Structures are given as C-alpha cells and as structure tokens.
C-alpha cells in the first residue's frame, strides 16, 4: 500500500486567496505544491481537511500527499524541516507523520474546531490586528453566550449557510459553541462534526447582532426555523477566523497527542 505523509500546518491567511488553488491567485495549496516540486522534481497533489477562505488563518490544518519513491521522502521529520526551510514565513509545518493506512485528510475527519477572535478595543493592538475583528461597539458577552447555546446540538443550519453552494444536507451537529473572554479579546470557540460554507462567520455575525442588542438571544431559534440565509445578518470578516484543530478517530490521533507538547516547529 502506498504510504502517505500527513502534515499539520499553521498559516496566516492574510496574503492568500484561501487554501484551494485558484487561477491567477496565490493559494496555500499552490505554495505547498510548488515547494514539494522543488524537493521531488515533479508535482505532488496535496489534499487538505477542508478549504479555508481568503484571509482565514489556520493553527491546525491537516493535509496529506502520497509519498513518492524518492530519497527525500523517507523520514517525515526531514520532510518537515525541508518544507519549513523553503516555505514563506507565514506558512509553517507544525508536525509531519507517515502512514500506510486508509487515512484521508478530509474524509477521515470526525470533528473540526474553529475559533473566531473579537477585539473589544475600538482599535486592536498592532500584534492582533491581522487576527481579530473589532466591531467598534459595546457587546453584551453574557447575552451572546446565552444565545450561542441555542445552536449547540444537531440542527438544520440552512440559515447559516451562504447562498450559491449546493449541499447534500444542511444538517450539522455543533458540540461546542462557547465564548471565552480574556482582557480585551473574546474568542468564539466552535466545534462540530462539519461546517457549511461560511457557517462559522455567519454564526458570529448573528451573535454580534445579539451582543449589540439588536435581537434577544432567542432570535437564533427563529433563524434556525426560517432556513433562509437571506434573512440573516452579514458574515463576520474572514480575518478573525482560524481553523484551530481537526480531530480524527483511532488510529489517526497523532496530532491530538502532539497538540500541546510539540515544542519544536522544525524550523
């Protein structure tokens, strides 16, 4: 069976058109494929756990590629070091493992965790400005937290799925939707079994309406019931969003073990 290299990737999405290759645009996927071609001498297809949009970041994107018959592709740690030596400063391979199983970055995933960061300051601090959204109005965090609990569980999230995409189903399960406040930053932690296009940003947009007092917390129940995205608020901007973690079942739990104790980034 062909071996696969599995990568855990962090990136700052500011300068990119998203994960997926697009003509006449710079994508994370294309940068990785270009670097792999430099190492191997031929193009290698890289498959991720999911596509992040333009401007969206990642702390724990997962991607894999089939391991070519090449001397540089025998040791995952060496692959990690070579990639990090050649990648731009805003893309880092956090970890790399080799597997000979049926693992697939997308289809083997059982859960994902996204985090959206809000700044409560009218002007974010310089080192936060590329990674958080400042709504510039006062937010009632307690009301937002109350509203968030209405979305936890299995629901039809059609009202939170952007138009223009075809879905086999808009039913998803949210395991967690919590707000964590620390000093002047609020992090919306959203963990579920899968997400529709712009679903997290649309949820955050709805929570912002609750937080500024436009609607009561129970309004999210009405949104679920309408199943109509056109009646929802605008999406929150992409730059506050990050793909934090992707979960896999045994025996593919390498990065669950490494998430908190991987002190070396291989660069």
Curated annotation (Swiss-Prot):
Protein name stated in the entry: tRNA pseudouridine synthase A
Enzyme Commission number(s) from the entry: 5.4.99.12
NCBIfam families xref list: hisT_truA
Chain's gene name: truA
Family: Belongs to the tRNA pseudouridine synthase TruA family.
UniProt catalytic activity: uridine(38/39/40) in tRNA = pseudouridine(38/39/40) in tRNA
Keyword set includes rRNA processing: no
InterPro entries: PsdUridine_synth_cat_dom_sf, PsdUridine_synth_TruA, PsdUridine_synth_TruA_a/b_dom, PsdUridine_synth_TruA_C, TruA/RsuA/RluB/E/F_N
Top EC category: isomerase
UniProt keywords, alphabetically: Isomerase, tRNA processing
Source organism per UniProt: Chlamydia trachomatis serovar L2 (strain ATCC VR-902B / DSM 19102 / 434/Bu)
GO MF annotation: an example: RNA binding
GO biological process per UniProt: tRNA pseudouridine synthesis
Binding residues for substrate: 114
Record flagged with keyword NAD: no
């Amino acid at each position: 069976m062909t071996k696969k290299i599995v990568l855990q990737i962090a990136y700052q999405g500011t300068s990119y058109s998203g994960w997926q290759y697009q003509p006449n645009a710079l994508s994370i996927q294309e940068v990785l494929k270009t670097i792999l071609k430099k190492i191997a001498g031929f193009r290698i297809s890289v498959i991720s756990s999911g596509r992040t949009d333009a401007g969206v970041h990642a702390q724990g994107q997962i991607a894999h590629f089939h391991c070519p018959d090449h001397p540089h592709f025998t040791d995952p740690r060496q692959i990690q070091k070579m990639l990090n030596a050649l990648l731009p400063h805003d893309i880092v391979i956090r970890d790399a493992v080799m597997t000979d199983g049926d693992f697939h970055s997308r289809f083997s995933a059982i859960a994902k965790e996204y985090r959206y960061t809000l700044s409560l300051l009218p002007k974010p601090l310089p080192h936060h400005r590329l990674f958080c959204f400042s709504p510039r109005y006062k937010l009632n965090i307690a009301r937002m937290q109350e509203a968030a609990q209405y979305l936890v569980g299995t629901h039809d999230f059609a009202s939170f799925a952007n138009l223009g995409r075809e879905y086999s189903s808009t039913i998803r399960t949210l395991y967690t939707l919590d707000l964590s406040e620390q000093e002047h930053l609020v992090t919306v932690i959203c963990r579920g079994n899968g997400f529709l296009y712009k679903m997290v940003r649309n949820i955050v947009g709805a929570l912002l309406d609750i937080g500024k007092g436009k609607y009561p917390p129970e309004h999210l129940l009405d949104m679920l019931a309408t199943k109509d995205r056109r009646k929802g608020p605008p999406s929150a901007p992409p730059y506050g969003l990050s793909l934090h973690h992707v979960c896999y079942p045994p025996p593919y739990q390498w990065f669950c073990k490494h998430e908190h104790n991987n002190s070396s980034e291989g660069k």
